[in-house]
Structure formats: C-alpha cells, structure tokens
Curated annotation (Swiss-Prot):
GO process annotations (BP): protein insertion into mitochondrial outer membrane
Organism classification: Eukaryota, Viridiplantae, Streptophyta, Embryophyta, Tracheophyta
This protein's name: Mitochondrial import receptor subunit TOM20
TPR repeats: 86-119
Originating species: Solanum tuberosum
Residue intervals annotated with topology Cytoplasmic: 1-169
Pfam families linked: TOM20_plant
Keywords: Membrane, Mitochondrion, Mitochondrion outer membrane, Protein transport, TPR repeat, Transmembrane, Transmembrane helix, Transport
Membrane topology note: Single-pass membrane protein
Function: Central component of the receptor complex responsible for the recognition and translocation of cytosolically synthesized mitochondrial preproteins. Together with TOM22 functions as the transit peptide receptor at the surface of the mitochondrion outer membrane and facilitates the movement of preproteins into the translocation pore.
Amino acid sequence: MEMQSEFDRLLFFEHARKSAETTYAQNPLDADNLTRWGGALLELSQFQPVAESKQMISDATSKLEEALTVNPEKHDALWCLGNAHTSHVFLTPDMDEAKVYFEKATQCFQQAFDADPSNDLYRKSLEVTAKAPELHMEIHRHGPMQQTMAAEPSTSTSTKSSKKTKSSDLKYDIFGWVILAVGIVAWVGFAKSNMPPPPPPPPQ
C-alpha cells in the first residue's frame, strides 16, 4: 500500500512538472507556475539516485530563482528555495561546501518569514535549519550519504552499526520533512490553479 502511495506521488509530481513546463512555454513570467515547477522537481528528486537527485535539485533551484526574478517578494518561492538548498546540504559530504548551502537556506527562510511572520511553517524551517549543521555532521560521520543509504549490513561492531542506522534514520527524517513540506506547497498550488487534478488511483 505504501509503495502504491509513493508511486501515486511520483505520477502526480511528474504530471505537475510536465504541466508547469507547458505553461512556461505559454507564459515564462508566471511566478506561481515557476514556483510549482521548482517544487515538483524538488519532490521528484527524492526518487532519483544521488547524482541525478543533485541535478534535479539544481534544476529546481534555477526555476525558483527565476520565479524570484519575476517577483522578488514571493515568500513561498523563497521558502521552497530554502528547502532546495537544505536538500543539497544533506547530499554534500564536504562541510565547507555544505556551509554555503546552510547560509543560503537560512537567508531564504529568514526572508520568507520576514515577508509572512504569521506562517508557522516558515518559523519551523528557520528553527530546523539552525540545527542542520549538527545533523549534517551526524549523517556524514561514517562517510558520504551514498554509503549511509546503502542497504548492505555493516560488518563492524554492533555499536557502529547502531550509529550508522541512527545516521540513516536522521537523514530520512530530515529529507522526508523537507520533501513533505514542499509537497504540501505543490499540492496547494495546483489546487488553486485551474488545471484539473490527475485522475485518482483505482480503488484497492
């Protein structure tokens, strides 16, 4: 059932991406559409291997920056861009490189919160980002995320294995939180648009 749900999400956001691409060809200055496009790419990135995921996150970043060029005060685009930088952080083992993304994410979340202080999600994003460097170190303590994500069992002591599992759990908690939040924005964005939603999955 969970696999079916994941597949439905994949189909939905692929549909969203293609629809946004079509709309962009008709109106490249639609900031709402660019934001939805970036959000859909960010969602789809979690279904890809690490290298492809990084590229998709970069594409999402490009679309969100384009949206902000059209409308610099668009706080939902700022927030999504912060999530894109955060996603990039946890796929980047090098702390110096990751620090650049940390700073960009914090700046985006702060600007989004300043533009809409009543938005609880923006406030929580700022709080989580403040803890992100510590979580990043925990995740990459045993090597790059590619290794952390590997399914093969550890041949080291049970203590190290436990720590590795904890790191993996942390990674999925963080990445899952980011993706879930972006997914909510994308769903709401498409609900507000005139585009009919994709057909519901057949009853189980």
